[in-house]
């Protein structure tokens, strides 16, 4: 399960973006608000929280700049009749905070202003999310901490495996640690094999 992606923002369309990670392009669907924020970042390194949906014939990735929007996205889909497309459509018009306020205050007008959101859907949103929206920030913060912990563990494992590989080739631990740390700092998405290969190439120069 992909929870986060970090790579070069290759291109943006009106409904999705493509992130290039080591030559592999990942198509990631996002809300209009997220796409607008990233439109000036093409060619730069970006990081997105990811929600992965696996179907029989395909895998869909949905990306968010912050975990609060990801939580709101999943919360919206818990409402009867709302799928991924409508959830992104709502978040293209309202931020998670605006959505939270609209439902908490039972502000139907704010939701009614969104095209495709009719009275029956508004009723379901008000009823089914009324007791949930207050927890958006808490859930987002807890999930972010878990992802940060996972990222840290992944970083440590990659470096540790690469160091072990270089030591097996007769390179001292101190030298292996130094050269691998330098490379990993420049290429945080690199795999163990690529990290070892790059280290050997750099050492041979």
UniProtKB/Swiss-Prot annotation:
Intracellular or extracellular location(s): Cytoplasm
InterPro entries named in the record: DNA_helicase_Holl-junc_RuvA_I, Hlx-hairpin-Hlx_DNA-bd_motif, NA-bd_OB-fold, RuvA, RuvA_2-like, RuvA_C, RuvA_C_sf
**Keyword DNA damage set for record:** yes
An example GO CC term for this entry is: cytoplasm
Main location group? cytoplasm
List every stretch annotated Domain II: 66-144
One Gene Ontology MF term: ATP binding
- GO BP term, example: DNA repair
- Which keywords does UniProt give here? Cytoplasm, DNA damage, DNA recombination, DNA repair, DNA-binding
Q: Where is this region: Domain I?
A: 1-65
Query: One Pfam annotation, family name?
Result: RuvA_N
Q: Where is this region: Flexible linker?
A: 145-153
Task: Write down the NCBIfam families for this protein, in alphabetical order.
Answer: ruvA
The entry assigns this protein to a family as follows: Belongs to the RuvA family.
In the record's own words, the domains note is:
Has three domains with a flexible linker between the domains II and III and assumes an 'L' shape. Domain III is highly mobile and contacts RuvB.
The annotated subunit structure for this chain is: Homotetramer. Forms an RuvA(8)-RuvB(12)-Holliday junction (HJ) complex. HJ DNA is sandwiched between 2 RuvA tetramers; dsDNA enters through RuvA and exits via RuvB. An RuvB hexamer assembles on each DNA strand where it exits the tetramer. Each RuvB hexamer is contacted by two RuvA subunits (via domain III) on 2 adjacent RuvB subunits; this complex drives branch migration. In the full resolvosome a probable DNA-RuvA(4)-RuvB(12)-RuvC(2) complex forms which resolves the HJ.
- Provide the protein name: Holliday junction branch migration complex subunit RuvA
Taxonomic source organism: Orientia tsutsugamushi (strain Boryong) (Rickettsia tsutsugamushi)
The primary gene name is ruvA
